[in-house]
Amino acid sequence: MSSYAIIGFGCAGYQAARAIRGRDESGAIDVFSDVGLAPSNPMLTTYYTKGALDYTGMFPFGTLPQITEQLSIRFHGGQPVTGLDAKRRTLVAGGRETGPYDKILISTGASAFVPPIPGHDLPGVMPMRTAADAE
């Protein structure tokens, strides 16, 4: 049985877990995320803030319990990966080493770029990508 680690659980991490599960029904998949939420779609945060979606609408793939059951993954939320030993194929998350893994995917996402235009540093001006940003 193969083992997989996915670091980051945004859209890319979720789609990777789906793809792995589609090819390997029995492999162990460990997903590590610095937040304890289901993967969200960053573009939907604005719909939530203007009231066009409820909070759950930002999570188009389902709830975290639904996803972990459907894909049979072990989710390690609130455990950012702070170390990686590529040679030994191990990770450090939550203060402890995990692994080894046969394959490791780093899908930690992006950060918003705020251009240095006049007003970018005014109160209330901010990037919005995450559910926490939308709150």
Give the role of each language-model region:
Residues M1-A5, F61-E135:
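FAD-binding core/adjacent interface of flavoenzyme oxidoreductases
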Residues S2-I73, E135:
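Beta1-alpha1 glycine-rich phosphate/pyrophosphate-binding loop at the start
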